[in-house]
């Protein structure tokens, strides 16, 4: 059974239900939050039954997915309480178009087994990335405060070091900056990723510091799941604390608007982990997962 959730009331019920399963449901929760608040990426939510669902998948509407090779748009967020049910649900072509290049995102690492099983059935290759999931202490206090009982907040100051404000000016990104962001984004560097970045800049808040020449020296933005992503710093401005200043600014903007604030960092990126620690962004017991799927 596939139930599309239509209208604000059903989505608000889903959001409320997903809160009970945070932080494991975070990728889906963040996406549903932004569907309720404008839905600029034209997404839809599907569940196996309603209201007592086992599995929820958020994905674009079919008319958005016109390019079979564009896995930036062909992206699915998944949360499931039941791995067996999840596999049956994801197998359906009405839920996931397995003929396309696509990506699946989830805060549940145990879905890896389910997706590997599907790979052998549907005949596609997988590239799995598992990174550290960070959530701001303010978001934790608001959405799942019980987690703070097990965390020590006494270390990070919560504020970045001051920057030279005569040299650098806090600003936001413009669509013309998409090419620069794309060049330095680990998952980007191509035409499709640039279109995706342009769409994110147009629809969501972003932060940057402009260097003396008036172009971005460091930046961060957010995607359709509400995650802070695609951050970067020009090589000549690295090691000056600019990225922590920009992330702190973006955090404040998102918190003021009531958005959940979260991000991910590679396990090998010690500098970003230290920055997260300083800004009181806490590592979660669950991970950030992405499965890039390519038909064979």
Swiss-Prot record:
<feature type="modified residue" description="N6-succinyllysine; alternate">
    <location>
        <position position="183"/>
    </location>
</feature>
<dbReference type="InterPro" id="IPR013652">
    <property type="entry name" value="Glycine_N-acyltransferase_C"/>
</dbReference>
<keyword id="KW-0007">Acetylation</keyword>
<dbReference type="GO" id="GO:0005739">
    <property type="term" value="C:mitochondrion"/>
</dbReference>
<feature type="modified residue" description="N6-succinyllysine">
    <location>
        <position position="169"/>
    </location>
</feature>
<dbReference type="InterPro" id="IPR010313">
    <property type="entry name" value="Glycine_N-acyltransferase"/>
</dbReference>
<feature type="modified residue" description="N6-acetyllysine; alternate">
    <location>
        <position position="141"/>
    </location>
</feature>
<keyword id="KW-0496">Mitochondrion</keyword>
<dbReference type="GO" id="GO:0006544">
    <property type="term" value="P:glycine metabolic process"/>
</dbReference>
<feature type="modified residue" description="N6-succinyllysine; alternate">
    <location>
        <position position="141"/>
    </location>
</feature>
<feature type="modified residue" description="N6-succinyllysine; alternate">
    <location>
        <position position="16"/>
    </location>
</feature>
<dbReference type="InterPro" id="IPR015938">
    <property type="entry name" value="Glycine_N-acyltransferase_N"/>
</dbReference>
<keyword id="KW-0808">Transferase</keyword>
<feature type="modified residue" description="N6-acetyllysine">
    <location>
        <position position="113"/>
    </location>
</feature>
<dbReference type="Pfam" id="PF06021">
    <property type="entry name" value="Gly_acyl_tr_N"/>
</dbReference>
<dbReference type="GO" id="GO:0047962">
    <property type="term" value="F:glycine N-benzoyltransferase activity"/>
</dbReference>
<feature type="modified residue" description="N6-acetyllysine; alternate">
    <location>
        <position position="127"/>
    </location>
</feature>
<dbReference type="GO" id="GO:1901787">
    <property type="term" value="P:benzoyl-CoA metabolic process"/>
</dbReference>
<feature type="modified residue" description="N6-acetyllysine">
    <location>
        <position position="159"/>
    </location>
</feature>
<dbReference type="GO" id="GO:0047961">
    <property type="term" value="F:glycine N-acyltransferase activity"/>
</dbReference>
<dbReference type="GO" id="GO:0009636">
    <property type="term" value="P:response to toxic substance"/>
</dbReference>
<feature type="modified residue" description="N6-acetyllysine; alternate">
    <location>
        <position position="16"/>
    </location>
</feature>
<dbReference type="Pfam" id="PF08444">
    <property type="entry name" value="Gly_acyl_tr_C"/>
</dbReference>
<feature type="modified residue" description="N6-acetyllysine; alternate">
    <location>
        <position position="256"/>
    </location>
</feature>
<dbReference type="GO" id="GO:0032787">
    <property type="term" value="P:monocarboxylic acid metabolic process"/>
</dbReference>
<comment type="similarity">
    <text>Belongs to the glycine N-acyltransferase family.</text>
</comment>
<feature type="modified residue" description="N6-succinyllysine">
    <location>
        <position position="267"/>
    </location>
</feature>
<keyword id="KW-0012">Acyltransferase</keyword>
<feature type="modified residue" description="N6-succinyllysine; alternate">
    <location>
        <position position="256"/>
    </location>
</feature>
<feature type="modified residue" description="N6-acetyllysine; alternate">
    <location>
        <position position="183"/>
    </location>
</feature>
<feature type="modified residue" description="N6-acetyllysine">
    <location>
        <position position="167"/>
    </location>
</feature>
<feature type="modified residue" description="N6-succinyllysine; alternate">
    <location>
        <position position="142"/>
    </location>
</feature>
<feature type="modified residue" description="N6-succinyllysine; alternate">
    <location>
        <position position="127"/>
    </location>
</feature>
<dbReference type="InterPro" id="IPR016181">
    <property type="entry name" value="Acyl_CoA_acyltransferase"/>
</dbReference>
<keyword id="KW-0216">Detoxification</keyword>
<protein>
    <recommendedName>
        <fullName>Glycine N-acyltransferase</fullName>
        <ecNumber>2.3.1.13</ecNumber>
        <ecNumber>2.3.1.71</ecNumber>
    </recommendedName>
</protein>
<feature type="modified residue" description="N6-acetyllysine; alternate">
    <location>
        <position position="142"/>
    </location>
</feature>
<comment type="function">
    <text>Mitochondrial acyltransferase which transfers an acyl group to the N-terminus of glycine and glutamine, although much less efficiently. Can conjugate a multitude of substrates to form a variety of N-acylglycines, thereby detoxify xenobiotics, such as benzoic acid or salicylic acid, and endogenous organic acids, such as isovaleric acid.</text>
</comment>
